[in-house]
């Protein structure tokens, strides 16, 4: 079993909250192409992607699931990798509960994303 398949339940659970923007296959293809990165842990995983803005590059946590402490541990490795790729910031999109959980880890809320069907 590959790491991606082992992490599939966490990825699919996170996708259920992602606004129906991607399927598991989309994520698998993104990882295979190098446009997304898989950060596996024994009891969780995260998926990141680099976002290039005119003034900076961000390593964006696109999906995360599993045990919170393991997710916190893996962000250190992801941040180091992101710095090596020229990123100056790490961002995350997720449910509102992440704000409370991440504040103690030095994260701050800089914007809110809202959605309306059209």
What residue ranges belong to the model's regions?
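Short amphipathic alpha-helix that is part of the acyltransferase structural core
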Residues: 1-22
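Active-site rim helix/loop that mediates acceptor-substrate recognition in acyltransferases
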Residues: 15-36
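Conserved donor-binding loop and adjoining core beta-sheet/short helix segment
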Residues: 32-69
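Short glycine-aromatic motifs
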Residues: 36, 104-107
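Short glycine/proline-enriched coil/turn segments at helix->beta-strand junctions
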Residues: 40-44, 84-87, 108-110
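Acyl-donor binding region in acyl/amide transferases
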Residues: 56-105
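Conserved catalytic-core motifs of GNAT/GCN5-like acyltransferases
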Residues: 93, 108-118
């Amino acid at each position: 079993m590959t790491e991606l398949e082992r992490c599939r339940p966490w990825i699919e659970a996170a996708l259920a909250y992602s606004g129906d923007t991607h399927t598991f296959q989309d994520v698998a293809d993104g990882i295979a192409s190098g446009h997304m990165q898989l950060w596996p842990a024994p009891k969780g995983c995260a998926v990141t992607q680099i976002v290039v803005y005119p003034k900076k590059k961000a390593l964006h946590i696109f999906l995360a699931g599993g045990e919170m402490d393991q997710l916190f541990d893996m962000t250190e490795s992801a941040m180091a990798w992101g710095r090596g790729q020229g990123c100056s910031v790490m961002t995350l999109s997720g449910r509102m509960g992440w704000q409370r959980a991440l504040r103690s880890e030095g994260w701050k809320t800089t914007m809110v994303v809202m959605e309306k069907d059209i």
